[in-house]
């Protein structure tokens, strides 16, 4: 595996962990992980990159080795502001190459619409996979949020790291033993009771009171000026959420069409965690596009 180095920087009053691969003077790529994930998730893609890159991958607030926010709810706009601060720190004067998976893809694509001059190229890995909400869902959503405020969610614990690895493979049967063991090592830590839990603030599991407004997202996407590559798995998350793979594919194509300069690539034999399932092909697509 390619070696990484850790750095801790101050981002909007929080201590952020940032993982680096490659020479500091090499061309930069920023990689943004998804929900209940962390920067180590990109190790397998980085191992498959053939060109010389300086890969910069933060742990989002409340994930991995980054500091927890201290609030009982995490808000999407904070990720945008955190990303802007990170880019100012590492690339204050130049537009950047962004790669985001899932939540990271959502953040990167909205940011690219809000700050089009700051993004040179964007690769979204299974981003934009949330189901559209309707206004009628608002009362129930607020009720759910209030209920969770009275009964905060927690994180499951495991007796050993091997159990963490087994759980990861249960969630994703395509994950190999070797990769599951690596992820368990970097995703989990022992608590005071000697049990293992994911390195994440349990508050991330609290439902957002805000609905997913697709029209607002597509408006942001329409403002993107950078070339965008949407990479989806053969078994995309949106298709699973819609209980229809063909309908999910059609929805992905509809949404991507909102981006002026965009293309879609599908990775065979991969699901939502395509960076774990087929990192060789994902790395090839990334470098071909960049």
Language-model-detected regions and their locations in the chain:
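Alpha/beta-hydrolase fold catalytic core
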Residues: 1-29, 50-53, 92-94, 129, ...
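Active-site loop/oxyanion-hole signature of alpha/beta-hydrolase fold enzymes
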Residues: 11-14, 57-99, 267, 284
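Conserved HGGG/HGGXW glycine-rich cap/lid loop of the alpha/beta-hydrolase fold
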Residues: 17-68
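Conserved hydrolase catalytic core segment
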Residues: 93-138
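A catalytic-pocket lid/entrance helix-loop region that shapes and gates access to the active site
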Residues: 125-158
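Catalytic active-site module of serine/aspartate enzymes centered on a nucleophile-bearing elbow/loop
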Residues: 258-290
